[in-house]
């Protein structure tokens, strides 16, 4: 209502002129006949409307007072409705920009041990995207309005486009910042994190309006020359380059190589400054690159290198906190909560906050809650996937495929299984033995034959004879193979081969291995391997100790753990010390060690398990021979030979008597962290993948729940009356814009291009409606632009900044982009429009004339007030306030009142100058 009140004041001030009771100031030149406003340089508004770019004049052009009031209401309502449509199409436009700027490329990452892996690097620099596509997305209506106004009115300068740019800049600088300062909860504050970038963009914002004043009032008053217009346009890329240099610290430091850091907002690797290397090292160093002495001595990299795992640590901490908060939930449930938590707390782009604010206003619901609900309803990628092996055929195989037996056992029994299928066929499968180190005839009996599985039978056994001898020898093995499967009917009659689906097939394991253990030795004791990799989440690891080359007698085997880089005593694992007792003919024992789960993303610590000398407890004749004799009697030759043979049979340690255990990170936990990081890419949240999804969103009403709970466990709230009203007011626009290409198509560029065209069309309509509304009520275009049009184009940005101020931990997303957008509006909005017009009139041999009075005054007024506002923001960074936003109640209210007062004064002075109550330039 404040803008309406100010306009009312302005109308009262200019009322005598509008009613024809006064004449223009004699000292001012007469207005040109072709201007839509009868007197752009004069003092009165005009009731005579001119045709717009798209809308014709509403005939008759001299209506009665009642018709004027009705027309004004129609124009105003239509303009508000167009602003709603503009907000919704800007929502789609910003979503496409988020998808474009989130594009990534792959790089090769080389670990310190030489291993390589593939990582992702964001192509767009965050600062560059904020000043280019993001600024274009939030300021597209103002920029296109200026361009369309000039091009649609025979390349003549108007007041609506430039006035909207300056008025929007004032609204953003004063009202948006005032709202952001006020909404921060008591006792909290927000600071700008990237202060260097803010300084650069703020300086360019001030310079942009100083440059406008120089063009309009100093260099060539009343005329915009070609070089001035083109230089204004060139300042845009120069501003972007300076901001990029500030972000990379190239203005202060020199870098000779490129580093990468992990962006805490999206969890992906972002390239830093310098020349790109072919590959990078995960420890912060690079292939073919020397590390500076100080960094190499400390063993740490610079700040960017130390931030490499920042986002992963955040996700890991989230999971740990959620485990403590919800001890009764399993990992899958915790992951679902963590996904929402990570989305809620990560830093977000301005595009996201703009989209979130628009959808909350139009009854489309909370973006994050909708994404979390869709993810919960969406089945897993593997759910319901058909089993390739479940094709209706019976599967025949050995179960198990490994067998051990002593050479004195006589025979070994092997099992063959038949699983699956319909169970109404007879299967014939052949088997035969094959030599390994054991030979048929000397170590085992050669065997071959046929197994018959009748309908309903699921298991068959076959027996192989083992040959015993009295010769001490190493363990030996042989094989048994399944082959030549035939299928019969239920009565056992063979069926002819058909071209249909097979009823049975042989599957792995088709080969069984039988190991024959020598029974003439107490055994050789060792671990199965020298190295064992375990995950820290295992809890307890089972380590097998095998007894080979014999299993005679009872043997006690001591063992103990020894620290390596991993520490016992409950730090990384629990110490283990004890004895394993192998009974007669027992060939395997298991010892257990408890592993401590630290929930680390990357881990590689080791410890050792050592076996002690085996002790022979219950012995046979060999033990008696070993103990035979005393120190006084010399053994006979026969006794010495017997003792030598017995010595060969005593238990000993094998080659693998020391096992290295390497504790690694949990792969499930690591994959969970990676999935959480991947899922929090905001392009996946706000983008669309199909027209079906877009139309479903368009016709669905959702609750506009702006406040977020920590874990998303709150029950979903029903839409309010306001949500339903806003949905039905905007459902036409939602369904219409659902016809646009989804943001996923062509990496967002298809939606981007179509949105530009639609925004241009709506902007042209808004410009015509605003001009016709102004001429209907006698309101000058310059006042109409700084109040109604600027307000309509800036309302979504206000809500977006409010949401960003509340949810972000810093002030960059809420106010840090305001200054950048203001500079971009001038350099692009006026630079493009004036460059086209100046070149056009230069070709015609005539100058491009711009009426300087109102615009130059507004620019000067805004520049002075902007200096005051930026100075206040910088002062608020002092410790007793804490930051640009929020702070103690007194300074917060004072800052809010000051910024709102500056905006009211700007509107008031601009209106007074437009109606000649105060003199401008």
Curated annotation (Swiss-Prot):
The modification Phosphoserine is found at residue 622. Residues 91-130, 186-196, 247-720, 771-772, 844-854, 910-921 are cytoplasmic. InterPro entries: CaCA, CalX-like_sf, Calx_beta, Na_Ca_Ex, Na_Ca_Ex_C-exten, NaCa_Exmemb, NCX_ion-bd_dom_sf. It catalyses: Ca(2+)(in) + 3 Na(+)(out) = Ca(2+)(out) + 3 Na(+)(in). One of its GO terms (cellular component) is axon. Residues 248-267 are annotated as: Putative calmodulin-binding region. Alpha- repeats lie at residues 135-175, 790-826. Mediates the electrogenic exchange of Ca(2+) against Na(+) ions across the cell membrane, and thereby contributes to the regulation of cytoplasmic Ca(2+) levels and Ca(2+)-dependent cellular processes. Contributes to cellular Ca(2+) homeostasis in excitable cells. Contributes to the rapid decrease of cytoplasmic Ca(2+) levels back to baseline after neuronal activation, and thereby contributes to modulate synaptic plasticity, learning and memory. Plays a role in regulating urinary Ca(2+) and Na(+) excretion. This is Sodium/calcium exchanger 2. The gene is Slc8a2.
